[in-house]
Amino acid sequence: MIELTDVDLVIPPIRKGDEARVLLKEINLTLTERRIAVIGANGSGKSTLLRLFNGMRQPTSGTVSVKGHDVAEEPRKVRQLVGFIFTDPLAQLLMSTPIEDLTLSLGHLPRKERAGRAQQILDERGLGHLAHQSIYDLSGGERQLVALACVLA
């Protein structure tokens, strides 16, 4: 379950004379343990909301919790519970090949186990043949699948 309690998110002015932008005000929201979709127009705040869920952005006031874990107090734990894929997966794929990206995502495992587990995950998802290809040689859909595998790892 994800809960937002009295959440405000205010972006301070960028330039002198600008006003602060209020993005969220007094938001109270509870999402139960189901898969959800966040939809809306470009620039409507979907990514900002998701970043609040996994601690990539902190609210100006209020609390965000995931399965009872406060995002501000336990960011590492929350990031293990909440993941999302960017529209452009290149924004989150940091390494040169899928196997390297997935190995990086498995940092919670002992170092000796990571590469083998990464290959296993790719194989289980029908992506094993892409393991050592350049990220830039993959199609957009293949990049999305690799990004999803990294998030689920």
Language-model segments: residues:
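A short, flexible loop at the N-terminus of ABC-type nucleotide-binding domains that lies
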Residues: 1-4, 9-26, 32, 74-75, ...
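The feature captures the beta-strand-to-loop junction immediately N-terminal to the Walker
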Residues: 39-41
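Helix-to-loop junction immediately C-terminal to a conserved catalytic motif
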Residues: 54
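Conserved ABC transporter NBD signature motif
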Residues: 62-72, 78
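Conserved ABC ATPase "signature" region
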Residues: 112-130
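Conserved ABC ATPase signature
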Residues: 134-138, 142
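Hydrophobic anchor residue at the start of the ABC signature
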Residues: 148
